[in-house]
Every structure is written in structure tokens, then in C-alpha cells.
Amino acid sequence: MQDYKQPLRIGVGGPVGSGKTALLEVLCKTLRDTYQIAVVTNDIYTQEDAKILTQAEALAADRIIGVETGGCPHTAIREDASMNLAAVEELAQRHKNLDVVFVESGGDNLSATFSPELADLTIYVIDVAEGEKIPRKGGPGITKSDLLIINKIDLAPYVGASLEVMESDTARMRPTRPYVFANLKEGVGLDKIIEFIVDRGMLDAK
């Protein structure tokens, strides 16, 4: 019989540079005093994102595992999630009362999805700098993730993107699913993201 808790597993995906690691840093720093948190990061040949989170002091180093996927990072979160599942298990055994493990995918495209075996909830991050067309391009990350975050809204005027157009496209592409417009650098939208995690993840409100 296992002597540790099964944590809520939240997959965090999105293209390179969209703000996945920034999201994890701010979530860890905000939630770590209330909940027991750990993180698994995926990089192709390095443990760069794990190092970034450790250096930012988002969590203690023993709460972060960096998985080096080699080859295609999508496979490690979908078809063969064994390395990630093993990392989640290791963290759960190491910290027996974990509430949440975030699993950050390697930089992926709009078609990447998490295996249901690996993630109980999925958050997908895109950013305004990629252009206002991104939501209407669709793909499972846009249409099927449990929460979509449109990050870096402060850049809209500089890249000629209309947030109104992005919002109407997003609402059309995922009519029944939630989304948040955010500027994670400044903490804009963070309260809604945390509310989603606590409510949908059925975490005990503390």
C-alpha cells in the first residue's frame, strides 16, 4: 500500500517563449505557502527550465525534476509519457503530502496534447506577440485545453494585435471552455488562473 498522496497533476503547454516557465514561477511563488507544490520540466537536451525555476527560488531544488526528453518533446507528454510519470511518482514519494505537480512540456506547437494518464488538467499558454491570428488557427492546445492563457497582453499595441479580435476568436474556438487574458510579468490575470486551479482541481481552499 502506498504511503503517499496522489497529487493533482496539471500539464502546462504552449509554444517556446509564450511564458510557460514564467507562469510556473509565479504560480509556485504564490501557492507554495498554501499548498505542497512540485514541478516536472521537459527540455530536449538540457534541464534549462528546471535551472531557471531553481535560480528564481520558485521552489526548493528537491521539488523540481528536469526531464531530458531527447528527440521529440511531444512524445514525452503524449505517446510515451513514462519518463514524466516516473518523475511525478518520484516527487510524490519524496514529498508525501504533495497537493499539486505541474508538468511543463518542452516547447511545442498548437497540436501538442498531454496524455490523460499524465495530466488531470491542462493549461495552454499562447502570447500576443505571436500575432492575433493564433486563437483562430485552432489546434488541440487552443480548443481542448482546460484553461487557455493569452499572455503578454501589454505587447498588443507594439505588434499591432487587437485584443478584441483575439477575444472573439478565442470565444468562438472554445465556446464552453475558460480563458484568461494575462500579463504574467505584472501579475495581471493571475488571480483568475489560481481560482481555476483551486476550483477545477478541487483543492481544499485554504
Swiss-Prot record:
CDD domains: UreG. Facilitates the functional incorporation of the urease nickel metallocenter. This process requires GTP hydrolysis, probably effectuated by UreG. Gene3D superfamilies: P-loop containing nucleotide triphosphate hydrolases. Homodimer. UreD, UreF and UreG form a complex that acts as a GTP-hydrolysis-dependent molecular chaperone, activating the urease apoprotein by helping to assemble the nickel containing metallocenter of UreC. The UreE protein probably delivers the nickel. One of its GO terms (biological process) is urea catabolic process. It comes from Aliivibrio fischeri (strain MJ11). The keyword Aminoacyl-tRNA synthetase does not apply. This is Urease accessory protein UreG.
